């Protein structure tokens, strides 16, 4: 498809972004072109927008960023047989090689050569985005476009919570950003006996209650370690989901976990974190697991099942919608933490 499109461009050397006209992407024989209907802002996008140390070390602007979206397929490559024009889709945003040992043994989510849409390649904050056909996930016709756009981050929450979780356990979610809020909903829907949401942001703690938290702890007012202990009869949480990336919160996550419990870390600290491995992991017999992306496509199937069955109610997490040209409003809300999920409409 020839012509230009409007897109959100990350420029080098400074915070912010610009809304510009750029060429519509050209697809190869294995790719599809999608007209974007909705694109949501992720914490990773905020790192890029802010141009922090992580962004400076990882991305190579100028380029189109953004990676969470839904849309309609408008063009398919000549070798594509699994996707058709007109289909309503979202996409797995980790583009893998398919040839390394993890890929060949069913662990594509930890492919050694992963490229991430909108981080390592041009992304979806635009009118059009291209994707390998192998990454496409087909959406049911009745799914709202904004909800379809947040299936990818919901997959992060599902992967974080459901890896090793069993019904009836006590779960603590540390950090109630959008994915943390989704993790609260997933834990509650999946049979957790108790879901404790921990954050310093009162706005997001209120959202956590809407998403199903049984208890909330404001770290500005309360000691999270003492309160988790009190709420769990001194046992600690069976599963702690660390979503904040703050060094203190990471150390506290290990301490608040029950002996023999699990700590799942999805967050991305900007710098190395010092922990007491001997006392907080080894002697407690903890299982600590890093969570990256989504299992392909087991996690997507779980997300689809939870949404279509009505088991999980995720819409309250979408708090704001803006035309894409008003992106600055959305990013400012994300930077201040005065929102759940923000969706941009091209």
Curated annotation (Swiss-Prot):
Residues where Zn(2+) 1 binds: 42, 67-68
Disulfide bridge positions per record: none
Coiled coil ranges: none
Compartment(s) where it occurs, according to its Swiss-Prot or TrEMBL record: Cytoplasm
Residues reported to bind NAD(+): 179, 199, 204, 266-268, 291-292
A GO term, aspect molecular function: zinc ion binding
Enzyme class: oxidoreductase
Superkingdom of origin: Bacteria
Principal subcellular localisation of the protein: cytoplasm
Ligand binding (Zn(2+) 2): 97, 100, 103, 111
Gene3D superfamilies on file: Medium-chain alcohol dehydrogenases, catalytic domain, NAD(P)-binding Rossmann-like Domain
Catalytic residues in the record: 44, 47
EC number: 1.1.1.103
Gene Ontology terms: biological process: L-threonine catabolic process to glycine
A GO CC annotation given for this chain: cytoplasm
PANTHER family listed in its UniProt record: L-THREONINE 3-DEHYDROGENASE
NCBIfam families: PRK05396.1, tdh
Family: Belongs to the zinc-containing alcohol dehydrogenase family.
Task of the protein: Catalyzes the NAD(+)-dependent oxidation of L-threonine to 2-amino-3-ketobutyrate.
Name of the protein: L-threonine 3-dehydrogenase
